[in-house]
């Protein structure tokens, strides 16, 4: 025992000794009233305990040690715990958020804010938003954020012309689909928060609206894991399994993930075309059935290494493999009967490296390799007994390299500046070769190589006031080249957050952006879908330029009212066109003059007791779409659209909850297309059991098969009807098992008051762990 005491004494005396200066601050609630009796624990960044104290009646506190950098843990029975990192001797005002607490017969009620605003970012705790909802991964939780809507696998944000997802505030060379796959395999409890940003700051190296998914960092000794499996029925039955492991110490955190999915999809489309060719009108009916089956394997390994308390290194590998994707399209109608078989193999590898320093410098690099090989066979029999047929061998090779460097400086009086540079190089190779071609079709072989380079450099200026008001302005210069196309551009960005009080927050943001077309869209190629429909490439397709102005008013950190204006020059979209020289339905991306949208949105959460929570989201806007060069039928169209979503959550007991979500959208337009109204009703349940180690969820999405709009064209002689609202109802079951936990030594009582641990016991325990 004496030797253990001596070891504890030696270790204790080996701790750094600081001058007798003091760390001070003030604890207040959301009404700026002092909080008495809050426990403040001071630690080093590696979680080494230093000292603890209690806030006084006026909310003030003082701590004697003053290390170069530290973290404070602030706790109180009636408020949510906060963790703050600092370097200054005066940490200023620390605001605590209230929480609900059930203490035997006494119920102390507090209301958790829906959103927290910091530096112009709307921060949401995903674990809180999804704790009662039937969500099974980070992607599904993001789709439940206020103002966010998912449609056909694409996320959109009310008031934004486009939406980009990033992880940990840094860019990636993975595509949106590849990032979605990663998030669908990421547990919700690995995410610290999601930040909604209407005007992304330049250090994110993306522009426009962004959702930044911030992953949790661990400074404790722990081993945690999660195993899950799911079943899904959407005409076909599908399923999969996923495993996640995390091993963490104050120095190193290792994450490993593997998932396997057996996906089977059925799509069905009814088409009626009244096709005018010369002086004759042909009525063409067609039913198309597309089935796809595949296995997908996803793997990710991420290592975070804390070099010291100031420097951190992150390395991650992500892989996605689809070795045997088989698809068959069968079209049967009055004009033709066709069968198209397609076999595809896809592989994706991504490596990302990030380094963060203690003096504001961040460096990073990212590489993605994507390969796709496909073989197609098509046979078409026309009503005049002629045949069209071909076999095709094609593929795509993409290499993307990205590097960036960012630097921030803190100036006196809470001013700040930032500057940085990024470079993206992409090499793309597309090819397709037709063989055994017969009939009245003239396919062209394609062998195209494209090199794309994007260089960005930026400068930003920011200011924060003690009241919480802040603003940031920046300008990003960009030099972009693809093939023989070269373009210089400047993108301004600005955001202002005015905090009259925590109950009244105003936001204003301006952003500009460019969206570039896909590589395949710019090829002079034709892809035959069947004997009537085809997709044409568009050489010379120009990028679209987006201008966005957003304003938000946030009341009581819950209710959000927003106004927005969006103008997009050279907007491009794919719209159908009935050819005038032959019986063919052409799908082709074309540049419009512009698309303009102006509107408003409102988000209203409400609840009744502890058993019912709901959120109402309403969006109304007018769109104007103009194109002078859409084949031979230019258009200039306007349309009002309204979207309403009501999320309902019913809590039955502590561990069981049900949800019911309804979404309705009024008719809309896309070029010459008229889109009918849609309605989506989804029901689900969530059951936690085995001391919250197990979770079972069940959900039925799109109960009435009405989430896909009927489409029609009635414009300048074009007459077309398309109905794809088949087989969209989806039933899914998910089971998740969580295991592991913390090996840490600090203990807190059930009432969140610190239990003082003798320093000898602390080091004795550490000695036992390291010397078994």
Annotate each PLM feature.
Residues 41-43, 75-79, 91-130, 150-152, ...:
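Short, acidic, small-residue-rich periplasmic hinge/interaction motif at the N-terminus
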Residues 45-60:
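Short, acidic Ser/Thr/Gly-rich low-complexity loop/linker segments typical of extracellular
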Residues 139-174:
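Extracytoplasmic beta-strand/coil segments of soluble accessory domains associated
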Residues 252, 296-322, 341-492, 497-503, ...:
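Face-selective signature of the C-terminal outer-membrane beta-barrel domain
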């Amino acid at each position: 025992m004496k030797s253990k005491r001596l070891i504890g004494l030696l270790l204790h005396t080996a701790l750094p000794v600081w001058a007798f200066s003091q760390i001070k601050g003030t604890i207040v609630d959301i009404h700026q009233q002092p909080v008495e009796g809050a426990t403040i624990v001071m630690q080093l960044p590696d979680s080494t305990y230093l000292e603890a104290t209690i806030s006084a009646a006026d909310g003030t506190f003082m701590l004697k040690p003053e290390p170069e950098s530290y973290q404070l843990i602030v706790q109180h029975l009636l408020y949510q715990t906060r963790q703050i990192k600092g370097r200054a001797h005066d940490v200023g005002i620390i605001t605590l958020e209230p929480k609900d607490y059930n203490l035997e017969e006494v119920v102390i009620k507090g209301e958790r804010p829906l959103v927290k605003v910091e530096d112009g970012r709307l921060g949401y705790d995903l674990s809180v938003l999804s704790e009662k909802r039937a969500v099974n991964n980070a992607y599904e939780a993001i789709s439940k954020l206020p103002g966010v809507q998912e449609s056909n696998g694409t996320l959109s944000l009310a008031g934004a012309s486009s939406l980009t997802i990033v992880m940990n505030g840094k860019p990636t060379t993975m595509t949106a689909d590849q990032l979605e796959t990663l998030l669908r395999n990421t547990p919700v409890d690995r995410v610290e928060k999601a930040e909604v940003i209407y005007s992304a700051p330049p250090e994110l190296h993306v522009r426009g609206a962004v959702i930044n998914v911030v992953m949790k960092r661990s400074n404790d000794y722990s081993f945690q894991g999660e195993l899950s499996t799911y079943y899904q029925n959407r005409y076909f039955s599908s399923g999969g399994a996923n495993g996640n492991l995390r091993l963490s110490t104050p120095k190193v955190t290792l994450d490993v993930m593997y998932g396997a999915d057996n996906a089977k999809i059925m799509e069905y489309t009814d088409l009626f075309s009244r096709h005018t060719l010369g002086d004759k009108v042909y009525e063409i009916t067609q039913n198309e059935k597309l089935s796809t089956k595949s296995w997908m394997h996803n793997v990710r390994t991420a290592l975070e290494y804390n070099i010291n308390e100031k420097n951190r290194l992150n390395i991650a590998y992500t892989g996605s493999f689809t070795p045997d994707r088989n698809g068959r399209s069968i079209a049967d109608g009055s004009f033709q009967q066709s069968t198209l078989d397609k076999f595809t193999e896809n592989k994706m590898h991504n490596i990302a490296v990030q380094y963060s320093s203690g003096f504001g410098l961040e460096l990073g690099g990212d590489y993605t390799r994507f390969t796709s090989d496909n073989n197609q066979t098509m046979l078409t029999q026309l009503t005049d007994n002629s045949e069209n047929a071909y076999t095709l061998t094609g593929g795509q090779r993409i290499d993307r390299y990205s590097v960036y460097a960012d630097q921030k400086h803190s100036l006196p009086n809470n001013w700040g500046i930032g500057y940085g540079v990024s470079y993206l190089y992409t090499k793309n190779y597309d090819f397709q070769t037709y063989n055994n071609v017969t009939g009245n079709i003239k396919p062209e072989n394609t062998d195209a190589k494209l090199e794309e380079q994007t260089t960005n450099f930026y400068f930003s200026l920011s200011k924060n006031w003690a009241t919480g008001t802040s603003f940031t302005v920046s300008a990003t210069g960009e030099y972009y080249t693809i093939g023989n196309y070269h373009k210089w551009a400047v993108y301004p960005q600005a955001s202002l957050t005015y905090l009259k009080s925590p109950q009244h927050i105003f936001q204003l943001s301006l952003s500009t952006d460019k969206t570039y077309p896909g590589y395949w869209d710019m090829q002079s190629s034709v892809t035959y879908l069947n004997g009537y429909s085809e997709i044409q490439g568009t050489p010379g397709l120009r990028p679209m330029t987006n201008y966005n102005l957003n304003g938000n008013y946030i009341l009581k950190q819950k209710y959000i009212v927003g106004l927005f204006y969006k103008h997009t020059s050279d907007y491009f979209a794919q719209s159908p066109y009935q050819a005038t020289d032959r019986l063919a339905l052409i799908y082709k991306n074309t540049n419009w003059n512009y698309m303009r949208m102006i509107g408003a949105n409102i988000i209203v959460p409400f609840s009744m007791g502890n058993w019912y929570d709901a959120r109402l989201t309403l969006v109304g806007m007018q769109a104007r779409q103009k194109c002078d060069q859409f084949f031979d039928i230019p258009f200039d169209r306007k349309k009002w659209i309204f979207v309403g979503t009501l999320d309902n959550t019913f809590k039955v007991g502590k561990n069981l909850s049900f949800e019911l979500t309804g979404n309705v959208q009024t008719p809309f337009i896309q070029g010459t297309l008229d889109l009918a109204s849609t309605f989506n009703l989804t029901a689900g349940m969530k059951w936690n059991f085995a001391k919250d180690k197990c979770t079972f969820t069940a959900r039925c999405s799109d109960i009435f098969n009405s989430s896909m709009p009927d489409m029609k064209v009635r414009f300048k002689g074009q007459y077309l009807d398309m109905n794809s609202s088949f087989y969209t109802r989806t039933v899914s079951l998910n089971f998740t098992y969580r295991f592991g936990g913390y090996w840490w030594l600090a203990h807190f009582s059930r009432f969140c008051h610190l239990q003082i641990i003798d320093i000898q016991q602390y080091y004795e325990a550490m000695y036992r762990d390291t010397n078994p």
